[in-house]
Regions:
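Catalytic core of membrane glycerolipid acyltransferases/transacylases, capturing the structured
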Residues: 6, 15, 29-90
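Short gly/ser/thr-rich secondary-structure transition/capping motifs
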Residues: 15-22, 90-92, 149-152
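Membrane-interface helix-loop junction between the first two transmembrane segments
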Residues: 21-31
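N-terminal membrane-anchoring alpha-helices
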Residues: 1-19, 219, 243, 251-252
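A secondary-structure boundary/capping signal
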Residues: 24, 39, 61-62, 79, ...
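A generic structural signal for well-ordered alpha-helical segments
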Residues: 13-15, 74-75, 101, 132-133
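Residues at the C-termini of beta-strands that transition into short coil/loop
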Residues: 26, 63, 84, 144, ...
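Non-catalytic C-terminal accessory region of glycerolipid acyltransferases
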Residues: 92-252
Length: 252
C-alpha cells in the first residue's frame, strides 16, 4: 500500500521535471519471477526504475542506505532489501530474502556492480546476480540507464531537474536453460554474470572495465588472484628436479 501511494505521488513529478525516455518496456514480463539487472550511476536510479516499471520492484540496495534517517524511511517504506557489501552471512541473508520474492512471483531489481562506480564506465559484476537468477530459475532482464549521474552527481543531495534520463530494457535472459542448477560452480557464476554485464554495457553504452567498482571487493579479488598465483608458483617449484633453492631464485 505504501509503495503504491509513493509511486502515485512521485510519478507525475518524475514526468513533469525530468525528460525521461523509456525503451524496451515490452521486454518486461508482467507476471512470474523477474530479475532486473541494471548499471548503477546515481542514488536516484532506485527512484527512476521503479517509477517506470508497472510491476512493483523490490531493490537489493546497499546497507549504507539504511543507516541514515534521510534515506532509511524511503527504502523501508517501499520494502527494499539491505545488502551488506562486505559479504558473508549478512549478504547471504539479503540474497535469501530476494530469492523468496522471486520464488513468489515478484520482481527484484539489482545492481551487479554492487555500488556506484567512481567513473562513468561499467565495472565488473559481482556473481550474486547469477546465483540469484539460477536459484530462482527466473528470467533476467538487463537494463541500461543513462543520464542519472548528471541528475544527481556523486555527493549531491538534490536532483537537478530537466535533465534527460534514458532507460532501456533488453530482451529477457534465461540462464537456467543454459546452466541448469549449477549455482555452486564459480566458473558458471562468473561466466553467467559476465554475460549479463555484456548486455548491460550494450544497453547503457558504457565502456566496460574488468575491475570491481568497490575498492574493498577489488582488493579482495587481487588478494585471491595473488594467492592463486603463489600456489601455482610453489607447485611449479616443487615439481622441478633441480635444486629448489636455485629454482626459487630464478623464478623470483
Amino acid at each position: 500500500m505504501v509503495y503504491g501511494l509513493i509511486k502515485a505521488m512521485l510519478t507525475p513529478i518524475l514526468w513533469l521535471f525530468f525528460r525521461v525516455r523509456v525503451t524496451g518496456a515490452e521486454n518486461l514480463p508482467q507476471s512470474g519471477g523477474l530479475l532486473i539487472a541494471c548499471n548503477h550511476q546515481a542514488f536516484c536510479d532506485s527512484l527512476f526504475i521503479p517509477l517506470v516499471v508497472r510491476r512493483r520492484v523490490t531493490f537489493v540496495a546497499k546497507a549504507e542506505y539504511f543507516e541514515s534517517w534521510k534515506t532509511l524511511w524511503f527504502f523501508r517504506a517501499v520494502g527494499q532489501i539491505p545488502m551488506a557489501r562486505s559479504g558473508g552471512t549478512a549478504s547471504q541473508k539479503a540474497l535469501g530474502e530476494a530469492l523468496e520474492v522471486l520464488q513468489s512471483g515478484g520482481c527484484i531489481g539489482i545492481y551487479p556492480e554492487g555500488t556506484r562506480p567512481p567513473d562513468e564506465r561499467l565495472h565488473k559484476g559481482r556473481t550474486g546476480v547469477a546465483r540469484l537468477a539460477l536459484a530462482a530459475r527466473c528470467q533476467v532482464v538487463p537494463a541500461g540507464i543513462r543520464g542519472t549521474r548528471a541528475v544527481q552527481p556523486i555527493g549531491a543531495r538534490m536532483l537537478r531537474p530537466f535533465k534527460p534520463v534514458e532507460i532501456t530494457f533488453g530482451k529477457p535472459i534465461d540462464l537456467s536453460a543454459r546452466y541448469g542448477d549449477r549455482l555452486e560452480d564459480p566458473l558458471v557464476l562468473r561466466q553467467a554474470t559476465d554475460e549479463i554485464m555484456f548486455e548491460i554495457a550494450q544497453l547503457s553504452g558504457q565502456a566496460y572495465v574488468d575491475r570491481y567498482a568497490s575498492r574493498g571487493a577489488q582488493a579482495a579479488e587481487e588478494a585471491r588472484l595473488a594467492a592463486a598465483d603463489g600456489s601455482k608458483l610453489a607447485a611449479y617449484v616443487d615439481a622441478q628436479p633441480l635444486d629448489r633453492s636455485m629454482a626459487r631464485s630464478q623464478l623470483a
